[in-house]
Curated annotation (Swiss-Prot):
EC number of the protein: 3.5.4.13
Keyword entries, A-Z: Hydrolase, Nucleotide metabolism, Nucleotide-binding
Subunit details: Homotrimer.
Ligand binding (dCTP): 107-112, 131-133, 152, 166, 176
Protein name stated in the entry: dCTP deaminase
CDD domains on file: trimeric_dUTPase (cd07557)
Entries under Pfam families matching the protein: DCD
Catalytic activity from the UniProt record: dCTP + H2O + H(+) = dUTP + NH4(+)
Keyword Nucleotide-binding attributed: yes
Major enzyme class: hydrolase
Pathway(s) it belongs to: Pyrimidine metabolism; dUMP biosynthesis; dUMP from dCTP (dUTP route): step 1/2
Length: 184
């Protein structure tokens, strides 16, 4: 697998709509950086958040997830409570080519503050807004800034197109829009 360059990412965004909206140059003045980088794309977090709450003392169960475990917030600055968790989504909508796998890494600006972002790989043929998982590992409240960089996506090209893509097997998160909760 080869990691794909800024030239390839730009061309795929222009000709295949791989990333929409697409920011051609990295923006970093007065904000957490986002946009095209040398070998990746720094995506922004949208102002739509679901913050874990324990008001009803429920149990988190991925097979029977209760949406009441979250408080919804639309805001430019999301405050995640100490040792807590929030879901969000990217501003960008992604369409992944059949011969590409995308992995995500957190931004060092957030990681150095104890805020970890997690995203599972974007599989060949998948498309949608990416649901972002933010963990505040600190004993203090933490801020996440909407419309600024949240994570970096790295694009890996396989040696040939896959036999069965995410779209072919009708994956459960195909075409997701907004913050998407766990599905079984």
């Amino acid at each position: 697998m080869a990691i794909l360059s800024d030239r390839w990412i730009r061309e795929a965004a222009r000709t295949q709509g791989m990333i929409e909206p697409f920011v051609e140059a990295q923006r970093r003045d007065g904000c957490i950086s986002y946009g095209l980088s040398s070998y990746g794309y720094d995506a922004r977090v949208a102002p739509e958040f679901k913050i874990f709450t324990n008001v009803d003392s429920t149990i988190v169960d991925p097979k029977d997830f209760d949406p009441k475990n979250f408080v919804d917030r639309e805001t430019d600055v999301c405050i995640i409570p100490p040792n807590s968790f929030a879901l969000a989504r990217t501003v960008e909508y992604f369409r992944i080519p059949r011969d590409v796998l995308v992995i995500c890494l957190g931004k060092s600006t957030y990681a150095r503050c104890g805020i970890i972002v997690n995203v599972t790989p974007l599989e060949p043929g998948w498309e949608g807004h990416v649901t972002l998982e933010f963990s505040n590992t600190t004993p203090l409240p933490a801020r996440i800034y909407a419309n600024e960089g949240a994570c970096q996506f790295l694009f890996l090209q396989g040696n040939e197109p896959c036999e069965t893509s995410y779209a072919d097997r009708a994956g459960k998160y195909m075409g997701q829009k907004g913050v998407t909760l766990p599905k079984l």
